[in-house]
Every structure is written in structure tokens, then in C-alpha cells.
Amino acid sequence: MKQHRLRIKGPAGAIETVLDLPAGPPRGVALIAHPHPLHGGSLDNKVVATLAKAALAGGEVAVRANFRGVGATAGEYDAGIGETEDLLTVAQAVQAAFPDLPWRLLGFSFGAFVQHRVAARWPARQLILVGPALGRFDFAPPPIPAAIVHGADDELIPLAQVADYARAHAIPLRVIPGASHFFHGKLM
């Protein structure tokens, strides 16, 4: 794996971005979004790092960016609006280097909300919502094919709420037995 740390010019200033390249020719791009920036979320979050490892194992370029006000990313928290614009900016910059690869959008918690918004404006083939912050943010029906991964013992977002959303929108749901919101002890 080869890793590049970038600063991409965004609407509010520099966006700290990490690009992990697979060992062989890339088969796709996975844009991964972290949890809430006001609650310690960053591109180094353990769930986000696990998603990046899984993407790399599948031959995808793994792209992680810090939201506004986190790490070396400029700006301040913007309730998902500016964060959406920032991820779209990162996607455009990365697409210039990988113009013909298919995209997947992956987001954890607040990052799932932001990726849900990105999916309405970016030509990705799949949206993966991990521990989506349903009830805390507006999640309309996903605009592209989606899947959900959720902890059976999530203390922040009840599994029943996520199961109802998944059922209502015919979204495959994978429940991780014994997993909390942060998947303590359940990551690969």
C-alpha cells in the first residue's frame, strides 16, 4: 500500500486528505467519511480506518478527508452543508487522477449523513451507511443503491429505528451482534 497525504483546496480552505493506493491496479475508489467533528471524529477514527483497509483489500483507492475544523482542514463545522461541499471537492480532485474508476461512498455516523447528501450529487454506484445517525439528521430515501451496517447494541442510534428505515426503503441491513455504536472489539 502506498499512502499520500494531500491538502486539497476547498470552499473554506485546505482539506486534509489521505489517499491510500492498493498494491495492484485500482478497481474503484472508496470515499470514506468520518463521524461528527465536534465529538472527536476524524479521518483516523478506527471505524473509518477499518473501512479504508477493507476498500484496499478489495482493490479500491481509499480516500479519507477531515471535515472542517478537524486536523489540518480549514473552516468550522457546518452541520453537513459545508462538509458535503468539501467531500464533493475532494471527489472531483481525486477523479482527475482516476477518471475511469467506479465510486463507492462510505460514511460512519455523521459521515453517513454527509455521504447520503453527496450521493445525490456524485455519480457513485453504491452508498454504504455504517451506524447512520438516523433521527439526528435528515435521511431521505437514498438516491443510489445502498446498504447499512449497524451494531446490534448501538447505544446512540437504536437498531429498531435503523431496521425500520432499511425496511421502508428496501435497503439491505447487516447487523453486527454485540456491537456498540463505535463497534468496540468488533472491527477486523
What kind of feature is each model-predicted range?
Residues A152-I157, H181-F182:
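Acidic catalytic loop of the alpha/beta-hydrolase fold
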Residues Y77-A97:
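Alpha/beta-hydrolase active-site loop
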Residues P142, A146-H150, D154:
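Short beta-strand/loop motif that positions the catalytic acidic residue
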Residues L106-Q115:
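Gly/Ala-rich beta-loop-alpha elbow adjacent to hydrolase catalytic centers
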Residues G75, A179-M188:
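Catalytic histidine-centered segment of alpha/beta-hydrolase-like enzymes
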Residues A23-R64:
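Short, surface-exposed "cap/lid" segments of acyl-processing enzymes
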